[in-house]
Amino acid sequence: MDKKVTEVVEAFAQPIVEELNLELVDVEYVKEGQDWFLRVFIDSEKGVDIEECGAVSERLSEALDKEDPIPHLYFLDVSSPGAERPLKKEKDFQQAVGKQVAIKTYEPIDGEKMFEGKLLSYDGTTITLLLTIKTRKKEIQISMDKVANARLAVTF
């Protein structure tokens, strides 16, 4: 992923999204096969609909076409982050307390790099998870500097 492109797009997208009373969740810029994709994820407390995605897409496309900050041809996709929304900002973790989450760490902790459980707490530097391993429960703490990525987890 090209970090510079995502930062530039975030700067263009943030005021557009805020003007529409939405939240900018994430921006991805990835190459799949021969094609580049610019994915912008938006949300709100009530969720987002196709009209809101279309409005952001139209305004963002106009702004990007005018300034032309991206060196490649690309497909722009604006959508909701879905049920397994990524947790990136402090606010995301705070809102996820009490919910099921999936955490991937940079380094193994007790021999594991993937954890799924209930997020019990988040204090800005550490998360506490309640894991269910077969029939027993175990609390673990993970320092945020060890978290490679985190997302909400859907359970059935």
Curated annotation (Swiss-Prot):
Keywords, comma-separated and alphabetical = Cytoplasm, Ribosome biogenesis
List, in alphabetical order, the GO biological process terms annotated in this UniProt record.
ribosomal small subunit assembly; translation
Q: Which residues form a coiled coil?
A: none
Superkingdom, natural source = Bacteria
Q: Does the keyword Ribonucleoprotein belong to this entry?
A: no
**Which Gene Ontology terms of cellular component type are present?**
cytosol
What is its subcellular localisation? Cytoplasm
- Any matching Pfam family: RimP_N
Its main localization is cytoplasm
Which family is this protein grouped under? Belongs to the RimP family.
**Its job:** Required for maturation of 30S ribosomal subunits.
For this entry, the protein name equals Ribosome maturation factor RimP
Instruction: Tell me the name of the encoding gene.
Output: rimP
